[in-house]
Amino acid sequence: MNILIPTVSPESVEALVFDLGGVLLDVQLQRTLWAFEALDIRGLGAAEVIDGNRACFRDLELGLITQEEFAEAVRRTFPAVAAIPDEQLLEAWNAMLMPFDAQRVELLRELGKRCPVYLLSNTNLPHRIRFRESFRERFGGSFDELFVRCFYSDELHLRKPDPEIYRSVARQIGTPPGKLLFIDDNAANVSAARGEGWQACHLTGGITVTDLFEL
């Protein structure tokens, strides 16, 4: 396995840790904003949803509320959707998730034969139910089985870029932080990982994860 990242020596990497959204799975947030607008939820921006600046989104991603409580919180926050059932709100919330790319799935399978591969994702139960179902329908089997272990923010009750999530994950993996290579599309998450001693790559500028490895 050759890692095509100038600052990383393959010999220095004992395990790979991938982000999900924007790295392994394309996410189009605008689709969810449009779906919410169609339900008469207006004025939401990316920062409120992705950065968790509204409590209902943040708490869902931290696993502090159930998906039913999330739907109820959305109805309380936006009275225009007071009569909208959970299913419609969750469908709009999941609209951002795009289909898995076959090349990226194959890359994960091949990388997993060469070194331990992990997932570290800020996500939530409704999204996880949907992307697992999408993966199973297209590729068969379990998405989570592509990894030695998946670390999900709502199960850890921690979110990137909180430094504690990197400490916790490194402890649970059992590999020195300097031997972990983390790949994420969010600059703050990458910076925080480096601050905890991880090697990290910011996936940006039109580069995809399949461009980073030569098998």
Question: Can you name each region flagged by the protein language model?
Answer:
Residues 1-16, 125, 130-215:
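Asp-based, Mg2+/Mn2+-dependent phosphohydrolase catalytic module
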Residues 7-102, 113, 124:
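N-terminal helical cap/lid subdomain that shapes the substrate entry/recognition surface
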Residues 19-22, 63, 111, 119, ...:
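Generic structural signal for small/hydrophobic residues in well-ordered secondary structure
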Residues 28, 32, 103-104, 130-132, ...:
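Residues at alpha-helix caps and immediate loop-helix transition turns in enzyme cores, especially N-
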Residues 103-114, 146:
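Catalytic-core regions built around general acid/base machinery
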Residues 105-109, 119, 166, 190:
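Short amphipathic alpha-helical segments and helix-helix/interface helices
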Residues 116-118, 199:
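Proline-centered loop/turn at the N-terminus of a beta-strand
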